[in-house]
């Protein structure tokens, strides 16, 4: 558990020492001594990894090592950064700088020697206490494999007394299993405890399945297995009366099994396959010739797709509230009639906490089954948050079984993914995490593999999603993950792990017993503030590396610059929505020289100090502050050469001039203003993927186009509307032929939409607002073959008639027509928009009626009508009902009153 975090820290420190070797000259001897100790530590960590469970001494050892590694990294990086600040200062200060440098070097050498001695002492104490022998021999502590073997035993037995919510899933999978020959592998994935094995059992014993196949085998693979054992079990299941199987060698078993599967119709269930590599180890016995079929369960969706890219991949779903309560009532039948209503209310609250996880509901039911009064239930409810994932003080092993099963998914993670997972403990319950921000948090912590931050972070998140540790739905319209969050149960596991690791401290005004504060808060290097009223509790925590202020529901004012001075080692600082006294960001922010991430998103600030020039390591800088007064931004951002993400204020002082040409590593640049920066600054920003620009009077698209041509990797382009936005009008040079561009927003004046050949060939999403187009844009837009969504917002089109032609918009999924004040008639021809699923009509006061041709758009699933005349609703539930009768979900908002059809 902790060793993952510690190993990650050692790897980062080692990389830092190698990367900055030239700047560490003069203290070579001390650095070499530190490296020798790190080698020893790394070997010990490898030993500890296999035998760490059940030993407080091992955990304490790892915690000491983690502190030492962090301290060493802080010392080295501070020295390097201070040395960088002294370079290029001119001759005048040379002598003074030299004296300071010699003093710094002497101090750093002494500090490194101190760290080295501390490491040596820890190793010595470890040996004297016998911990090293325990690590090697294992003592009596349980290994992960022991725990795995103890709790993970599954059988094909069909007896399930508490089945709820699986009937539909069974029917969805049984059909393809017996009727579609081309489907050879069916994969069921989902988080631990969600009911994958239960669902597989029901399919395994279904009457249709039993009639269809000639033989059946069920094998639980789990984490620890041998190739021979799995093959042997399958063959035994298919040939139960063959007594010679146990005496066969591996080669013979492989041949017999291959021949058997090749000649008959057999169903093989591989339950709980953890890794793609596990499939690779056992796949040789499965012939290519079809006839046999496989049902595979895994926490990792990628395992099934790896086994067969054409497999039927099915995600087990959580129970809805009604199903959860139904399951709970089967386990805890009604007994106490006099207190039933009170107990029902308490019980439903606790069941909701289980988040639809069947195993959690069953465990909770088992805990309450022998408690017959409301007061007993209330006591359990008050402690359920901590107890359902912690070491239960109650004599009920089932609580620990839930924790251990869910924990196995965490234990299986590689070192860097463990770090990614633990970072999610920062966020409040049900918090929607913006993925792009999350990736930058990770990168600022050193979880960054050298690709772009976006690609690197997306790889990590998708792996966590595949392992069912994180929920992140990709909508039909998006090509990237936008938001993610944790299932409540998994979040509690995450927080529990972070607590054991001293990974972070959560600060908030205690409101319930579920509030979790890290053990030994003084050793925690990360803080997250969930309440503005708790901000003063920060105190002086000089070793803290990250501070996130999240989910503020009240005003948080920062009045004192000392807040920053007391946190000199910060790498991550998120002050979104914070208010600064006098609108000024304190100049002491410049002392946070280690800072990689700074967010002032929607913060109340109008003046940035020039001291931010000292933040040389900055990767992510969000200055998209709350709109109010123009913001003073000093021309020092050009010195942040490591920047990958930069979001500027939408409104800056008229005299602001920013030179950004040296920021060649930018992947994301938003609110770039042609008034405050030169378009020539863009020429070398060839890594940009997301770009938002606002025009000034002195710049037209033609001026900008030469720089835009350099953006060959661009995915999102936005011409941002503001009161200062100005464009003479559409010009013939308007060509946006970026092959990777998926999303285009136009907030500028155009008399007509550019022609089809002037727009990106693979564009998927177009948003138009304040364009004041006089010509109908639909004849052009409907020819874009890859277009999935179109939004026409405030005065995008000022004409009276709009037509969607037959055969147009072949892939369009979503259409929004909003605040088109002059639109009177909209015609939809039969055969237009054959894939449209979602339609929104909003505040088009002159639009007389819904198109008659909408009745031909049979793919429509949802229609929202908002801010329209009352007659619209009356007609659509009356004489015009034929236009919408095929749409499952029709909603009216602010047309009179809300109504759902």
Swiss-Prot record:
Belongs to the disease resistance NB-LRR family. RPP8/HRT subfamily. GO terms for biological process: defense response to other organism. Disease resistance protein. The keyword Repeat applies. ATP binds at residues 190-197, 385-392. Pfam families: LRR_14, NB-ARC, Rx_N, WH_DRP. This is Disease resistance RPP8-like protein 3. CDD domains: RX-CC_like (cd14798). Residues 15-56 form a coiled coil. GO terms for molecular function: ADP binding; ATP binding. Residues 144-453 form the NB-ARC domain. LRR repeats lie at residues 567-591, 592-615, 833-858. PANTHER family: DISEASE RESISTANCE PROTEIN RGA3, PLANT BROAD-SPECTRUM MILDEW RESISTANCE PROTEIN RPW8. The LRR repeats probably act as specificity determinant of pathogen recognition. InterPro entries: Apaf_helical (IPR042197), LRR_dom_sf (IPR032675), LRR_R13L4/SHOC2-like (IPR055414), NB-ARC (IPR002182), P-loop_NTPase (IPR027417), RX-like_CC (IPR038005), Rx_N (IPR041118), WH-like_DNA-bd_sf (IPR036388). Keywords: ATP-binding, Coiled coil, Leucine-rich repeat, Nucleotide-binding, Plant defense, Repeat. Transmembrane segments: none annotated.
